[in-house]
Amino acid sequence: MSNGATAQVLTAADVIRLLDLKPHPEGGHFRETFRDTRLVEDNRAASTAIHFLLARGERSHWHRIDAVEMWHWHAGAPLELEISQNEGRIECITLGNDLASGQRPQAVVPAHAWQAAQTLGDWTLCGCTVAPGFEFKHFELAPQGWSP
C-alpha cells in the first residue's frame, strides 16, 4: 500500500501518460473523468470533473466560464490560483497540503470570474469540478499576455 510519497518521484510526463491527459487550450493537460447524466437547462450536464496538470513553464492562461468551478489539489507542488471578479483586483490562493503556511486543498472560482494558474514547482495535479457542467462553448480564453 502506498503512502502517497511516490507521487513526488514521478515526472509531469509520467503523470500525463499514466492518467492519459491531453493538451488543454488554456495550457496544461487534462482529461474529463466525470460527466453527470442528470441534465439541467439547455440539456447541459449538472456537473463535470477533470484531472488537470500544469508542469513547470506551463500556465493556465486567463480564462473564464459561465459556471462555478471548484479546484481540488491532488499531488505535486503547490499551485498558485489567481481569481479576478472585477477585472482589476486579483485574489491569489495557494493550493497545496501545507495548511500551516496558508495553503488550502481546494478553492472556488465564482461563475464568470477570470482565473489563471501556475505550478510553484515541477508539476501540480489538480481536479476541477464545474457546476453546471463544463462546455467549451461557455469557455472564454483571454488574449495572450492579457491580465485583469
Range-by-range predicted roles:
Residues 2-108, 116-117, 121-124, 128-148:
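Non-catalytic, conserved peripheral segments adjacent to functional cores
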